[in-house]
A protein has these predicted regions:
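Metal-dependent phosphoester-hydrolase catalytic domains
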Residues: 86-92, 102-171
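Soluble non-cytosolic domains of exported or imported proteins
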Residues: 34, 65-73, 145-146
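Structured beta-strand-rich core segments of catalytic domains in phosphoester-bond hydrolases
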Residues: 1-50
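Active-site metal-binding loops of divalent metal-dependent hydrolases
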Residues: 58, 99-100
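A long, amphipathic alpha-helix that forms part
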Residues: 68-90
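Active-site His/acidic residue clusters
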Residues: 49-68
């Protein structure tokens, strides 16, 4: 589709230390290569503290079977990277954000990325999804067929829920 994800930031608050596109290549039944948008990984300092960002724009729900498999694989790749970061340093600050092209209650999102709707349920490597509480029939990030959908989401690692630094999730 030739559409990439990006990160817009203010230099006075955020300093990029490293970044890399994470490219996934898929093969169909005829062994033809197929691509999705890259995941953008960025490590940087946000007001002096190291954060890890994964910016996504996942495949749409059109061509459900094909794209669902791609989405599941993307979730697995991100989850592995998150697990690696947290295994190396359990207090890493990690945010996964972007257009998930699905709701916060999607089972693949919950299972593959190990997300939780409540802060108190994040006790280890789980990710907190505050968007679950925001989704309703009266609001969202887009309207499809006259119905609100909440596809744009942010997921946070446990360290954002603790009061041990300058950066924390505040409701």
């Amino acid at each position: 589709r030739k559409i990439n994800v990006g990160l817009i930031y203010r230099q006075q608050f955020f300093e990029v230390e490293e970044s890399e596109p994470i490219r996934l290549v898929f093969k169909d039944q005829l062994a033809e290569k197929s691509y999705t948008r890259d995941i953008l990984y960025v490590k940087g300092k946000l007001v002096g503290e190291i954060v890890h960002l994964f910016i996504v724009h996942l495949p749409s729900k059109i061509d459900k079977e094909i794209n669902q498999l791609k989405r599941q694989q993307i979730f697995k790749v991100i989850r592995k990277r998150v697990n690696d970061l947290l295994t190396e340093n359990f207090s890493e600050k990690i945010i996964i954000m972007g257009d998930f092209n699905d709701t916060p209650t999607n089972s693949d999102l919950i299972e593959e990325l190990n997300t939780r709707a409540k802060q108190e349920e994040v006790i280890g490597k789980e990710l907190f999804n505050p968007m679950v509480g925001l989704q309703s029939y009266k609001r969202g990030s887009l309207i499809f067929k006259k119905q609100w959908m909440l596809f744009d989401q942010q997921l946070f690692s446990k360290s954002f829920l603790q009061h041990q630094s300058n950066l924390e999730y505040v409701k």
